[in-house]
A protein has these predicted regions:
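Non-catalytic terminal/interface segments that mediate subunit docking, oligomerization
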Residues: 6-7, 11-14, 225-337, 343-353, ...
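Structural signature of the thiamine diphosphate
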Residues: 165-233, 354-359, 378-428, 488, ...
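Generic long, charged, amphipathic alpha-helical segments
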Residues: 306-307, 460, 464-483
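A glycine-rich helix N-cap at a beta->alpha junction
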Residues: 33-43, 108-122, 143, 349-361
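Glycine-/acidic-rich phosphate or pyrophosphate-binding loops and their flanking alpha/beta elements
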Residues: 207-210, 242, 261-276, 292-298, ...
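Peripheral docking tails and interdomain loops at the edges
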Residues: 247-249, 254-258, 366-368, 387-388, ...
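Cofactor-binding active-site loop characterized by glycine-rich and histidine/acidic residues
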Residues: 1-109, 279-280, 284-285, 293-294, ...
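Long, well-ordered, tryptophan-enriched scaffold segments
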Residues: 121-266
Length: 632
């Protein structure tokens, strides 16, 4: 209906997040490639302007469509264009405060802006009975609009009483509508409100869009849809089918069990701790299942708070809980946490409140892609005074970190962990860092979190030294001192380099007189979608790539580049092109950046990048007792 009534891309269709855009992609030239969606080198599951001229605005984080659409509409008005701009937003995304900021601003304009509210839960307003549905159909039809316009014009010609009569009719009509459903919130903001209407009735939708195009002010069309319409399993369990794996059986609706995960381990451990501590509360932002808090919500409903898509509110709300004497545990995805930085500074860190921030989906997340990878949290969280940051590489470290935070002092604790499960179960007692000391005492490989495990495995195979951090702020001083005497240190980070852990650690080492060489492997740009294993390999963060980097056999370009859609998949070996990125205070230090080997990804139009985590324990090779003693 949208594509029949609007002329895309001249008229701009702005979809909020990406879950609504699949049909849009099928209708705009990507039908033949649709089986590649969310796969390595295939179509993105979200809107990507570089993928199609019909994808106007990047999508991924919710609640942005109205503000973006209003900006485009205002730009059109300045340029004298008559194009239409349409924002399509779901009722879930409308819980985000940014949506209402956009609505509040848009209602004051006379722009050609149309907002389509896709309500698949009836959570905005419920109509009651047949009459309101009948009224909605009538007032959404072009003939109604034509008649309404003619009557208003005719009344306007009547001297003295014409305009007052028009206003009386409007008030009566508004009063009748309010008897049946609450649409005044949008009309009070200045929108012409239409609906609710059946979102599965194409003819009615086309009528609504035609009417909205004739409005002299912004219009909001409220449509009601059934999530998963046409697929019985999805209709019965819509929450379970919000996102499914490629291993789903379409005939039964069953998915392959994902196994034990960091999220599940976090949720289980938090329930255990909450049983013994009545002060513990859990807060999330519309991600109860994703963050592993479903069981907590059932066991402790009075201490569980899902605040909707409102990360800023979640953090300030948690600070209020902390002021009241509770221990709030806030579980958010890394990519969405970016929205709450001011709250972290102003409402939490500045007051030194005890809040435990559990950052899920830290690092590469796989098929969700560019806007969902958690590549920035270490960089911005490291700037917060007094914060303690952990990045566990396995479940045992996660459980230990969570227990330490619950029993810790008043301050912000951050525990960040990746999507999915652990690669290798813990063999040693969790601690702040883990070290392997090989025969080669001149070379050290360093990382943290998930990639820290890869570093340790690579170090064992190469018989060099490896250091994996669990506690990344403040950096353990004995681990720092251990790094000082190496001739060469290779740093690997599953996140942005600037402001990241590896850069912070290297800076501290240089201040302490480090005289060796340093090579940093970290992304410089955004990362495309694809399998986690492939992306980590492309970013030179898997075990084999770490081995190749240290030995100089093969190195991957890690700066990240936008790749044309006709480029073929595969990593090509090429010449080494290390670039000096600066000298430390000690002039003998030679700090290099690993920046070699281009990577082509078939049909990918986004960039490659990555972020890392790690932890450390002591496993001694021959003659390693001295190093162990030094660390202890």
């Amino acid at each position: 209906a949208l594509h029949r009534k609007f002329n895309s891309p001249k008229d701009k269709l702005i979809f909020d997040v990406g879950h609504q855009c699949y049909t849009h992609k099928l209708l705009t030239g990507r039908f033949d490639d649709f089986d590649t969606i969310r796969k390595d080198g295939g179509l993105s599951g979200f809107l990507r302007p570089e993928e199609s001229e019909h994808d106007i605005f990047v999508s991924g984080h919710s609640s942005t469509s109205i503000s973006a659409a209003l900006g485009i509409a205002q730009s059109n008005a300045i340029l004298g264009k008559t194009d239409y701009t349409v924002a399509i937003i779901g009722d879930g995304a409308l819980t985000g405060g940014l949506s209402f900021e956009g609505l509040n601003n848009a209602g004051k304009t006379k722009t050609r802006l149309i907002v389509v509210l896709n309500d698949n839960k009836m959570s905005i307003s419920k109509n009651v009975g047949a009459l309101p549905r009948h009224l909605a159909v009538i007032r959404s039809h072009p003939s109604y609009f034509n008649l309404k316009t003619k009557v208003e014009k005719a009344l306007g010609y009547i001297p003295l009483v014409g305009k007052p009569m028009t206003e009386v009719i409007r008030r009566v009509k508004k009063g009748i509508k309010n008897l049946f459903y609450n649409s005044t919130i949008f009309e009070d903001m200045g929108f012409a409100y239409m609906g609710p209407v059946d979102g599965h009735d194409v003819e009615t939708l086309e009528d609504c869009f035609e009417v909205a195009k004739r409005m002299k002010r912004p219009a909001l069309i409220h449509i009601c849809t059934v999530k998963g319409k046409g697929y019985s399993f999805a209709e019965k369990s819509p929450a379970d089918f919000h996102g499914v794996s490629s291993g789903m059986d379409i005939n039964t609706g069953e998915c392959d069990p994902s196994g034990k995960s960091f999220s599940g381990t976090f949720g289980k451990k938090l329930c255990e701790l909450a049983n013994n501590n009545q002060k513990i509360c859990a807060v999330t932002a519309a991600m109860t299942d994703g963050t592993g808090l479903s069981e907590f919500s059932k066991q402790f409903p009075e201490r569980f708070f899902d605040v909707g898509i409102a990360e800023q509110h979640a953090l300030t709300f948690a600070s209020g809980l902390a002021k009241g004497g509770h221990i709030p545990v806030v579980a958010l995805y890394s990519a969405f946490l970016q929205r709450g930085f001011d709250q972290l500074v102003h409402d939490i860190a500045a007051q030194n409140l005890k809040i435990i921030l559990c950052v899920d989906r830290a690092g590469i997340v796989g098929e969700d892609g560019e806007m969902h990878h958690g590549l920035f949290d270490v960089a911005f969280l490291s700037t917060l005074p007094n914060a303690v940051i952990y990045s566990p590489k396995n479940f045992a470290e996660l459980e230990s970190d969570l227990e330490t935070a619950v029993n810790g002092q008043n301050r912000l604790y951050v525990i960040r962990y990746p999507r999915g499960g652990e690669s290798i179960p813990a063999e040693n007692v969790p601690r702040d860092f883990e070290c392997f000391c090989g025969k080669d005492k001149s070379t050290l490989a360093v990382s943290f979190g998930r990639v820290g495990e890869n570093v340790l495995e690579a170090a064992r195979e190469l018989d060099i030294c490896g250091l994996s951090f669990n506690k990344i702020k403040p950096i353990p001083e004995d681990a720092e001192n251990f790094c000082l005497d190496f001739d060469k240190i290779y740093f690997f980070e599953e996140g942005v380099e600037n402001g990241g852990f590896c850069q912070n650690l290297l800076s501290r080492l240089c201040q302490k007189g480090f005289k060796g060489d340093a090579v940093i492997t970290a992304p410089e740009d955004f990362v495309a979608h694809g399998s986690t294993a492939r992306l980590l390999s492309c970013l030179c963060l898997d075990k084999q790539s770490i081995i190749n980097t240290v030995t100089g056999k093969t190195q991957h370009k890690i700066s990240g580049q936008r790749v044309k859609s006709n480029e073929k998949s595969g990593a090509d070996e090429s010449k080494t092109d290390k670039t000096d990125i600066g000298e430390s205070k000690n002039e003998k230090s030679n700090i290099k950046k690993n920046n070699t080997c281009e990577i082509g990804i078939e049909k990918s139009k986004a960039e490659i990048s990555g972020i890392n985590e790690g932890k450390t324990e002591i496993n001694d090779a021959e003659n390693g007792d001295a190093e162990k003693a030094a660390l202890e």
